[in-house]
Amino acid sequence: MSTVTITDLARENVRNLTPYQSARRLGGNGDVWLNANEYPTAVEFQLTQQTLNRYPECQPKAVIENYAQYAGVKPEQVLVSRGADEGIELLIRAFCEPGKDAILYCPPTYGMYSVSAETIGVECRTVPTLENWQLDLQGISDKLDGVKVVYVCSPNNPTGQLINPQDFRTLLELTRGKAIVVADEAYIEFCPQASLAGWLAEYPHLAILRTLSKAFALAGLRCGFTLANEEVINLLMKVIAPYPLSTPVADIAAQALSPQGIIAMRERVAQIIAEREYLIAALKEIPCVEQVFDSETNYILARFKASSAVFKSLWDQGIILRDQNKQPSLSGCLRITVGTREESQRVIDALRAEQV
């Protein structure tokens, strides 16, 4: 009699799944962590809610109202979740039939779109971006049959550039009545003029992902948002967990989204942008750096000579970057989070010391 292992009992797609390699999963023993696009220093908050004996609200009123005011939308157009990553998954669960429907995304881009779909058993289709990392609209059009959700990250992680707004409009017209278009705006605070939040009235099939992990300096809080029209939000509410936000998370999120919290966030953004420009200018003068790409975010993508050796050399010095070599069209590329001036200087000095 054959023995059935625990792994044999698992779903086939889970057995075959490669989990998302988050910055923390990849590890490292560094003291300069520039691989997860986090804010470099901790922001302090005081807990004010002490009712931990009670279950929290599913959609905490103060958080929803504060975020709606900040984003310029109605409270009914906001869903809060455990990071934007949960929003990615909720959209697939609400709109895609496993074994029948597909999602579509455009690499090189964020890795969780495919992981979420594969976990649920939904087909992934890819249409690589053009050489300038803009959308291949003809390629997308050719593959749309059977696609229910299209993910577009703007500004894009890891390349750092915005997607052309006219291309977004064309995509929204192509998908009208066919699929949900998801604009992942995790980094939009660094270029707020480019947000599509004002387009929701025009496009009922548009959804927008947001997070407190980047500019709000709260990656450890795990708090994200989906902005969409009420019909979409109501469907997502059917598949979200009953208590997605703990009471302490909701408490801190509401404080971060207060008028004072928004002012503090914008000050952090200005500081990071100034530091980004300093680091870009320095990188362009370093011999082992072949190319530095423009960025609208809190990170910089650069192409290096012998990038694997450079990555390991800095890793061994406790400077942890993100290797993007395996992404389509990103051979030789490393992604560097913009940190403090001291961290920037550590990177600059280490790279200058590299033998080319």
From Swiss-Prot:
GO MF terms listed in the record are: histidinol-phosphate transaminase activity; pyridoxal phosphate binding
Q: Indicate where the modification N6-(pyridoxal phosphate)lysine is found in the sequence.
A: K214
GO BP terms, alphabetized: L-histidine biosynthetic process
Asked if the keyword Repeat belongs to this entry, the reply reads no
Q: Which PROSITE patterns match?
A: AA_TRANSFER_CLASS_2
Pathway(s) = Amino-acid biosynthesis; L-histidine biosynthesis; L-histidine from 5-phospho-alpha-D-ribose 1-diphosphate: step 7/9
Name the needed cofactors.
Answer: pyridoxal 5'-phosphate
Q: Which reaction does it catalyse?
A: L-histidinol phosphate + 2-oxoglutarate = 3-(imidazol-4-yl)-2-oxopropyl phosphate + L-glutamate
State the EC number(s).
2.6.1.9
Q: Which key words are in the record?
A: Amino-acid biosynthesis, Aminotransferase, Histidine biosynthesis, Pyridoxal phosphate, Transferase
Q: Indicate the family of this protein.
A: Belongs to the class-II pyridoxal-phosphate-dependent aminotransferase family. Histidinol-phosphate aminotransferase subfamily.
Q: Which HAMAP family match?
A: HisC_aminotrans_2
Among PANTHER family, the record links this protein to:
HISTIDINOL-PHOSPHATE AMINOTRANSFERASE, HISTIDINOL-PHOSPHATE AMINOTRANSFERASE-RELATED
Q: What is this protein's record name? A: Histidinol-phosphate aminotransferase
Source species: Escherichia coli O157:H7
